[in-house]
Amino acid sequence: MPAASPHKTLADVLAYLKANPGKMTFASSGNGSSDHLTAELFWLQTGTSGVHVPYKGGGPVMQDLLGAQVESSFMNINTAMPQIKAGKLRPLVITSARRSTLLPEVPTLEESGVKEANVQSWQAVAGPPGLPADIKTRLRDAILAAVADPATAKRLADMGLE
């Protein structure tokens, strides 16, 4: 939520959604995106509704969220972290099954009373079809070594990646 939002907790949001069905805007990076589907799952599990505002990517979502053109969004933590740290966004919940080590004070959806709505995203490394097995092994080993390196782990955490 934008830091200036009157909604300080998920309970505030739920109360507003129930009192004002179909009024609150939820921005997403596009139809069918993980943030769009997270909002749909949230509405389903809470018996509420909102206005889905699809954008063409996360950049325009952030711009309009910060500019109060839309009221809320579900977004990946690494996208939100710089604005959270700057005090421009207020995280209300984490959608994964457990709290984030990056924002340990922020409760999960389940802790906040929303059951069966755990969502998290992940990143992958892909190669071309037919990549030789020895190259796959070398690539895997290099990635595992990199993420095990404390300096790399810190850089990833600083970018909002766990």
What kind of feature is each model-predicted range?
Residues 1-60, 109, 122-155:
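Hinge/capping helix and adjacent helix->loop/strand transition within the periplasmic-binding protein
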Residues 4, 82-94:
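Extracytoplasmic "Venus flytrap"/periplasmic binding protein-like
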Residues 17, 41, 45, 59-70, ...:
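Short helices/loops that flank or line small-molecule/ion binding pockets
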Residues 20-24, 48, 66-75, 88-91, ...:
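Alpha-to-beta junction loops
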Residues 55, 74-75, 94, 119:
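Short beta-strand and adjacent tight-turn residues that come in two discontinuous sequence segments
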Residues 93-129, 159:
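Periplasmic-binding protein-like
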Residues 155-162:
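Surface-exposed aromatic
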